[in-house]
Amino acid sequence: MLRYIGRRLLQTIPVFFGATFLIFAMVYLMPGDPVAALGGDRGLTEAAAAKIRAEYHLDQPFWMQYLLYLKGVFTLDFGKSFNQQPVIDVMARAFPVTMALAIYALAIESIFGITLGTIAGVRRGGWFDSTILVFSLLLISVPTFVLGFVLQFLLGIKLGILPVTASVSVDFASLTMPAMVLGGVSLAYVIRLTRQSVSENVSADYVRTARAKGLPGGVVMTRHILRNSLIPVATFIGGDLGALMGGAIITEGIFNIHGVGGTLWSAIIKGEPQTVVSVTTVLVLVYIIANLIVDLLYAVLDPRIRYE
């Protein structure tokens, strides 16, 4: 098991360096001059522009800027934005909110998706299965902003059981509706993936053998069917954490949540490469850590993977 963990940890190293290099290169090659844009229509004097470029190392060659960027990543010194605000402070305000929202959405899609998908997979072809398929298709078809406005109207305005927008101090109630919207599409995919996987394993030879041995239905379901069916589902859910955090910009805008999506969009519009690169790098780290956890979960669900 330790060798398996060690291999997976070593595999994350080239992924990290490759991803950070691509991120930095794409931001470096973005059209326009962020320093010149600071002056607006009036522009900056050559001396002022040169001073800003020297302060942010923009006068250095590409490879030197990349090395300084890596040094900042490993020392947690992400520099300052053009308004002299430490980037790490900006991320410290944005990431906890979006992380809480993404984990909440992930919990919704995992609990309800696996439960509904399992029932539909066991009872494939019945009325419940057909209803769940239609429900998941609707979730996939409806745009995120439409689902957000519909839930705001029904749950927030008509029924009044949830806040329409998030408060300044984001709490559990304020995040419930945004989490439902953010995890809506992923919920549909988890339902369909679980249903397909369970329906295939229900008729597998090892399940028939377990039942022939007289094992109780609950034991067959938990130890045999679900344990093998959840491997592809765990792959999707693990990779979805980073996608939820990076793709929360629409949901955050609808519910007035000041998180990663809004921070990243604002940095792109304002032309602040330090903030864009730093936020994206942390998102990459979230992806890598989430996938590492999924790899370790594989070994728990299927011990054979440890020895491959």
Locations of the language-model features?
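Residue-level recognition of pore/gate-forming positions within transmembrane alpha-helices
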Residues: 12, 20, 42-43, 137, ...
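Membrane-interfacial helix-loop-helix junctions in multi-pass membrane proteins
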Residues: 53-62, 77-88, 168-171, 182, ...
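Membrane-water interface segments at the C-terminal ends of transmembrane alpha-helices
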Residues: 22-29, 71-72, 134-163, 181-185
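Alpha-helical transmembrane segments of integral membrane proteins
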Residues: 2-4, 93-128, 144, 168-308
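An internal, D/E-rich "acidic patch" concept
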Residues: 59-114
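Hydrophobic alpha-helical transmembrane segments of membrane transport/permease proteins
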Residues: 15-67, 159-177
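Small-residue-rich alpha-helical segments with characteristic i,i+4
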Residues: 15, 123-124, 128-138, 142-144
